[in-house]
C-alpha cells in the first residue's frame, strides 16, 4: 500500500496549520513556511513537531512531486 495523496486535502502542518507538500522520493511531507519535513512511516504521516526534520532554505523552495 502507498501513501494516499487524497489525504493532502485535509492534512496541515501541526505547527503553523499551513499547507504541506508531498515529497514522494523522500517519503516526507514538507512545510515550506516552517522549513520542516515530516516523515511518512508505513504509509502513515508522522505529524509530530519533535519528530520533524529541519530543512534548509534551498530545500524549502523546491517543488516536490
UniProtKB/Swiss-Prot annotation:
Of which family is this protein a member? Belongs to the UPF0434 family.
Q: Entry's Pfam families?
A: Trm112p
Specify the domain of life of the species encoding this protein. Answer: Bacteria
Quote the InterPro entries the UniProt record gives: Trm112-like (IPR005651)
Q: Which cysteines are joined by disulfide bonds?
A: none
GO cellular component term, pick one: cytosol
Q: What is this protein called?
A: UPF0434 protein CPS_2127
Q: Which HAMAP family match?
A: UPF0434 (MF_01187)
Native species: Colwellia psychrerythraea (strain 34H / ATCC BAA-681)
